[in-house]
């Protein structure tokens, strides 16, 4: 049991640090005129380039969560009924 816990811990740690291995620094010969290695690291990192693609799969789920429920009588739609609308319905 302890070995399976260790294995799970190693698996979780390796998956959580995988983005670090994708962001390897570019050698200075490939970058002309830049000496700041931190900027080179950020420029070579694919996860830093576009965060919208990374979270695109969550967009439909989040949209469904925040859609207000609407009923025929207007409850939940956020609209305020006037006396004419109440008499009409």
Curated annotation (Swiss-Prot):
* Source organism, top-level taxon: Eukaryota
| GO terms for cellular component | extracellular region; synapse
> In its UniProt record, which GO terms are filed under biological process?
neuropeptide signaling pathway; positive regulation of action potential; positive regulation of circadian sleep/wake cycle, wakefulness; positive regulation of synaptic transmission, GABAergic; positive regulation of synaptic transmission, glutamatergic; synaptic transmission, glutamatergic; visual learning
Propeptide, chain numbering? 24-67
The record's subcellular locations are: Secreted
Provide this UniProt record's keywords sorted from A to Z. Answer: Cleavage on pair of basic residues, Neuropeptide, Secreted, Signal
Q: Which residues form the signal peptide?
A: 1-23
Q: What PANTHER family is this protein classified in? A: NEUROPEPTIDE S
Described function: Modulates arousal and anxiety. May play an important anorexigenic role. Binds to its receptor NPSR1 with nanomolar affinity to increase intracellular calcium concentrations.
Protein name, UniProt field: Neuropeptide S
